[in-house]
Amino acid sequence: MAKKITAFIKLQVKAGQANPAPPVGPALGQRGLNIMEFCKAFNAATSKLEPGLPTPVIITAYSDRTFTFVTKSTPASVLLKKAAGVTSGSKRPNTDKVGKVTRKQLEEIAKVKEADLTAAELEAAVRTIAGSARSMGLTVEG
């Protein structure tokens, strides 16, 4: 018989830097899960990623106080800000432009995000990322 799922916990944790401090500790502690076990497993799973990049993770908690987790790719907004060299998006995206991204940068971001996007082909994924860039106040070149 399969284990009974008690909760899905969605968090954004910096790659390779999970520790028992908030938000990880309280979210797992109130479900009775082993916090240090998660931290070690998450840090090992994200060791190949650039340290400090926020990484979404979905933790499945079971009734016997065990868990599994799935990491997603870094949010597109974070990757776009990094590519454009800005710290935040525009407060008025249609009037105030804060930076530029090239078509090549969009393709690289689309390849990173490919598994999490529903786009059937790379071109559609690039258009999705370009839309995110425009909504942040970035100019898309190319």
Swiss-Prot record:
Could you state what the record's PTM comment says about this protein? One or more lysine residues are methylated.
Q: Which GO terms describe its biological process?
A: translation
Which Pfam families does the entry mention?
Ribosomal_L11, Ribosomal_L11_N
Record keywords: Ribosomal protein included? yes
The protein's job, in short, is:
Forms part of the ribosomal stalk which helps the ribosome interact with GTP-bound translation factors.
Q: How does it assemble?
A: Part of the ribosomal stalk of the 50S ribosomal subunit. Interacts with L10 and the large rRNA to form the base of the stalk. L10 forms an elongated spine to which L12 dimers bind in a sequential fashion forming a multimeric L10(L12)X complex.
Protein's name in the database: Large ribosomal subunit protein uL11
